[in-house]
Amino acid sequence: VQDVFDGWCEGFTELGHEVKQYNLGDRLTWGSVAHLGMDDGTYIKAFPTTRDVYSFAISGLPQSVLYWWPQVIVFVSGFTVDPQFLEVCRGRGIKTACVMTESPYEESRQLLIAPHFDVVALNDPTNINQYLSLTTAVYTPHAYRPAVHYEGEAHADYQSDCVFVGTGYPSRVAFLERCNFSGIDLALAGNWQNTPASIAEHVVHDLEDCIDNDQTAELYRGAKTSFNLYRTETNGDVVDGCDGWSVGPREIELAASGTWFARQSRGESDELFPMLPTFESPEELGELIRWALANPVERQIAAQQAKRVVTDRTFPNNAHMLLAACGLVKEETDG
């Protein structure tokens, strides 16, 4: 979510707008680890529950809004919002918008807060009609950051035959355990804690660490191949009903980085990337990776075609779309 937040901030800035950032992420981190010293020398959590942490993290926003008095407040994700605060802002003429990043996996949570925003921007339009019955909703595609995601030579430490950056959801772990990566230098990165040793041995950083988007992009540049594997979890449960239509951010970032990848079939993915092969089984994925490694010319041609397709998938374009939906874009007139 932080990467998406950074991208949207850059998008608004590149359009010439003044952007003030409320450091919600820092406050959430501090609130989750803060402890209070007791008279007996022991320590207790300053904010015992997740709800307490959220309340603390968001508590400084009203004061910030009073100082800044913006035309629009844009939340990214929005799971920590105070609905009453949003309604006060709307009553004072301040537009409220939310970039909802978890469609279609967590629609139930997102739909609960959607009515409190003037506009919601969805990363997948599968259930957009449900949102349109509650508020103004637009589909803003996943985007890349040209200063981060670009083609080039990577440092030797980041090079591999194949890379996958993401979270080790149970569905992904089960899939990857069935893949034959024998003889393939596989690099995994992201959140892979509590995964089997057969998976964890491929993680290229300390399991307790996280990697940022700059490191992710460097891994993409250093990989000969990659693949996209959608999760099947929603709110912690494995379900069959959360398949979406849109591509994920991984596909856009890989394409922008000029990296070939195998993919699972989805509506938008099939429209954008017919030049890249699809797989349905772990066995098929292994075969595709081996084919790509053995055919560098064909691999590079397909990667370049995919790169050209995503040229316009940028955050400034998304920011313009969101502001237009808020009624904050002046229409150009002739003469």
Where do the PLM segments sit?
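Non-catalytic N-terminal targeting/anchoring module and adjacent flexible stem/linker
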Residues: 1, 14, 328-335
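Active-site proximal beta-strand in glycosyltransferases
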Residues: 88-103
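C-terminal "capping" alpha-helix adjacent to the active site of nucleotide-linked donor transferases
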Residues: 280-298
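Nucleotide-sugar donor-binding catalytic core of glycosyltransferases
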Residues: 1-45, 49-60, 68-69, 77-84, ...
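A charged, aromatic-enriched C-terminal amphipathic alpha-helix characteristic of glycosyltransferases
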Residues: 294-326
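Short, amphipathic alpha-helical "lid/cap" segments that border enzyme active or binding sites
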Residues: 58, 62, 282, 286, ...
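N-terminal Rossmann-like NAD(P) cofactor-binding module of classical short-chain dehydrogenase/reductase
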Residues: 74
